[in-house]
């Protein structure tokens, strides 16, 4: 902020024309005169937007200090944009001016209308303090007392043990505990995580060199897998009763609610200018859904209100050195559900329900999740029986982190994490109890007793789509025969004709399989059968059906099942039944590549 301070015999002004940013003002302020006053010409700047209260307080102190020194009790606050070329948004500027006015207690204050063209005249006194300038900078706040955390292990029996004294027979849970206790260096490795090689080798996804670091491009197979994961998350939320919505990807930082919520993530944001407005690209779907909830007239009967959005792209400006394949990016896909609840009792009930969705996704995706429950110590002490109920419900130990005070919008959350091959967590599903955002975004519901702030649950039933695929690939990299879940495999059945004369029957088989909503292709290339089968193995195709002379005569197929290695003769219907049993009730999309491999381009 820039201030130009003048001690004057008088100042008088008259508004001439309203700009598009003009505030509504009473007639008495459109023309005014004040004598024996300190005039503060004020220009709010872009950097003020993240610390409106602090900047206004510092400005009021500076103005009051000079007014006291020149022995006047009269102050004129005069908006004056010409003091800076880096102006704050009009909304922020007006907020700051109004705040300064309210803070100048003990002074007679005249604030000239904001956003109006004005003519003015003044007579400046000639003493040494009659003309002064000040720059107000948002100061770094003193470091808060470090939040202390303690780790415990809560068992299904209700026994809680300091994490340092807990001995687990589950190697993966033990690794999660070690990581959270800061002992992960014992397991760290500088080697590239195997999913990075796999995502390229399997023609799923690659880095995009023409974009910013941490932005990916999805190849046809990867796009298909990603879309299926998106469909899965959508169905999980909708079948649970959530209503899908879609909201913008950028938000105005001059909104105090937006800037305060954004500040929770520090500097990890993409920011841009839209004309004179400072905007940010969202890092989650909170902003749009909270704005939607704010605009709704909610009554008690409307709750719980469940909204779901696939944030097709969320943005976090992670440090370049932290960017890792599918594990951490700057642009990612986040399924996001928010539930407005009547009170904490209802929020705790739906917390458990939504945590079930997270564990279900692990089963459906063939990913083993470990649970980390984080809470303030005060919340845990008040809700100990409920936390014990969670461990009992899911029949597993929970790593519990207790924080000495609340530093986020949540009082508790549960993260479900898989392990990568370096034995570090990949956090995927999460459920959080938010006690702050309803008030910040002015989200209310009405009861007979009056207005109330709802408690809001933040839930991602699967976690970020990229991380989900990362967890799947990292887990499969350790398997003797790696494979995607059959419902996610780009090609679920590959038909391999021994020679060209079997191609027509191969087409007939593929047609039947395709009509059963199974993704199928035909390896019609001029290669040996062994090479074709090996190629299918490299692509992790779960079912390979070879057709030779004997199979065509018998109208059968020589099928190899990838995971089991089992080889058996099947009819087309038997193959279809076998595959359908594995993909039943899971999302389906058709093959998006040429069905004939001879016509299929290579992307890697």
Q: Which residue ranges define each predicted feature?
A:
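Short helix-loop-beta junction
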Residues: 102-103, 361, 389-394, 507-520
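Short acidic loop-to-helix transition motifs that present clustered carboxylates
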Residues: 116-119, 250-254, 288, 407-409, ...
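Generic long, charged, amphipathic alpha-helical segments
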Residues: 480-532
């Amino acid at each position: 902020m820039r201030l130009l301070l003048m001690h004057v015999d008088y100042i008088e002004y008259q508004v001439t024309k309203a700009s598009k940013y003009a505030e509504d003002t009473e007639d008495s302020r459109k023309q005014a005169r004040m004598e024996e006053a300190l005039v503060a010409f004020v220009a709010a700047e872009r950097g003020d937007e993240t610390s409106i209260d602090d900047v206004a307080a510092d400005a009021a102190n500076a103005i009051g200090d000079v007014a006291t020194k020149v022995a006047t009790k009269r102050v004129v606050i005069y908006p004056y944009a010409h003091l800076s070329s880096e102006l704050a948004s009009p909304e922020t500027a007006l907020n700051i001016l109004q705040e300064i006015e309210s803070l100048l207690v003990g002074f007679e204050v005249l604030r000239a209308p904001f956003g109006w063209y004005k003519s003015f005249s003044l007579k400046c006194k000639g003493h040494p303090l009659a003309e002064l300038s000040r720059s107000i900078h948002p100061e770094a706040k003193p470091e808060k007392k470090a939040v202390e955390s303690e780790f415990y292990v809560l068992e299904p029996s209700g026994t809680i043990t300091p994490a340092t004294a807990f001995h687990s027979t589950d190697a993966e849970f033990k690794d999660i505990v070690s990581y959270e206790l800061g002992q992960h260096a014992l397991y760290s490795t500088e080697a590239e995580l195997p999913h990075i090689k796999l995502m390229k080798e399997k023609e799923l996804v690659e880095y995009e060199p023409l974009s910013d670091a941490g932005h990916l491009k999805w190849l046809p197979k990867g796009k298909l897998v990603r879309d299926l994961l998106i469909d899965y998350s959508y169905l999980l939320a909708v079948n649970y009763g959530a209503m899908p919505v879609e909201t913008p990807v950028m938000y105005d930082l001059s909104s105090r609610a937006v800037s305060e919520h954004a500040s929770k993530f520090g500097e990890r944001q993409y920011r841009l200018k839209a004309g004179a407005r400072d905007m940010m690209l969202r890092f989650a779907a909170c902003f749009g859904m909270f704005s939607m909830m704010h605009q709704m007239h909610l009554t008690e009967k409307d709750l719980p209100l469940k909204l779901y959005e696939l944030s097709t792209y969320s943005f976090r400006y992670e440090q370049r050195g932290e960017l890792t394949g599918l594990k951490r990016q700057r642009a990612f896909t986040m399924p996001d559900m928010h539930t407005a609840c009547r009170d904490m009792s209802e929020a705790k009930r739906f917390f458990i329900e939504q945590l079930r969705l997270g564990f279900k996704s692990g089963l459906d995706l063939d990913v083993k999740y470990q649970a980390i429950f984080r809470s303030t110590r005060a919340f845990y002490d008040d809700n100990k029986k409920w936390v014990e109920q969670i461990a009992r419900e899911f029949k597993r130990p929970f790593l519990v982190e207790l924080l000495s005070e609340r530093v986020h919008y949540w009082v508790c959350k549960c993260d479900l994490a898989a392990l990568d091959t370096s034995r570090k967590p990949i956090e995927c599903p999460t459920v959080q109890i938010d006690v702050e955002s309803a008030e910040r975004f002015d989200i209310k519901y009405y009861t007979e007793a009056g207005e109330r702030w709802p408690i809001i649950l933040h839930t991602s039933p699967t976690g970020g789509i990229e991380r989900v695929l990362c967890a799947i690939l990292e887990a499969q990299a350790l398997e003797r025969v790696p494979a995607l879940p059959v419902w996610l495999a780009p090609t679920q059945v590959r038909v391999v004709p021994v020679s060209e004369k079997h191609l027509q029957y191969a087409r007939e088989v593929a047609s039947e399989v395709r009509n059963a909503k199974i993704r199928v292709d035909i390896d019609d290339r001029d290669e040996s059968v062994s090479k074709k089968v090996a190629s299918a193995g490299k692509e992790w195709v779960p079912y390979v059906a070879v057709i030779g002379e004997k199979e065509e005569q018998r109208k059968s197929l020589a099928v190899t099942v990838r995971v089991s290695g089992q080889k058996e003769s099947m009819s087309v219907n038997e193959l279809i039944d076998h595959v359908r049993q594995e993909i039943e009730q899971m999302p389906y999309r058709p093959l998006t590549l040429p069905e004939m491999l001879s016509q299929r381009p290579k992307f890697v």
